């Protein structure tokens, strides 16, 4: 498969087995759900009726008062009572093996190419950590919400993109699958795409 570099118009040869992979929506969904679940702290905690502090005395006698019967002030029906099915701390993380992760990554990159949302450039850098320089450079390429993937993180790019909510910078070691799916377009350097290809073989 041949990819054309947008800045130099050179041709870059990549593996069709990786960047021409079939679209597997179910696998992508499973991996992204697991990825998102892993970020959950899971430290929610509520008290059941057994854990609420208070007297176990019956509030009033069973019959003769005209009021609804009550056996405890800790009842979930009462204010300040326990919760019926109290949430407890739990681990939400799901196991995703390497084969599934690689399959999802290949499927996402292949679909980005098919949808013409992947922009490959020879290199992507700016001379100074100025937001204006980055905006001017992006205007020549795209005006959409964009994810920029570089081989190594550059300080100038990171500082320039800090206050641009439509731009995210990452290196190939920290590719976020959720960002790959949600951003309108992905800009990636030629060196980065070859590194990704080596990892996914």
UniProtKB/Swiss-Prot annotation:
Any one Pfam family match given in the protein's UniProt record, by short name: Ribosomal_L4
Record key words, sorted: Ribonucleoprotein, Ribosomal protein, RNA-binding, rRNA-binding
GO terms, molecular function: rRNA binding; structural constituent of ribosome
GO CC annotations, alphabetized: ribonucleoprotein complex; ribosome
Presence of the UniProt keyword DNA damage in the record: no
InterPro entries in the record: Ribosomal_uL4 (IPR002136), Ribosomal_uL4-like (IPR013005), Ribosomal_uL4_dom_sf (IPR023574)
GO biological process, one term: translation
Chain positions covered by the region annotation Disordered: 45-66
PANTHER family documented for this protein: 50S RIBOSOMAL PROTEIN L4, LARGE RIBOSOMAL SUBUNIT PROTEIN UL4M
Family label: Belongs to the universal ribosomal protein uL4 family.
Primary role: One of the primary rRNA binding proteins, this protein initially binds near the 5'-end of the 23S rRNA. It is important during the early stages of 50S assembly. It makes multiple contacts with different domains of the 23S rRNA in the assembled 50S subunit and ribosome.
Oligomer and partners: Part of the 50S ribosomal subunit.
Descriptive protein name: Large ribosomal subunit protein uL4
Organism field: Baumannia cicadellinicola subsp. Homalodisca coagulata
Gene that this polypeptide is encoded by: rplD
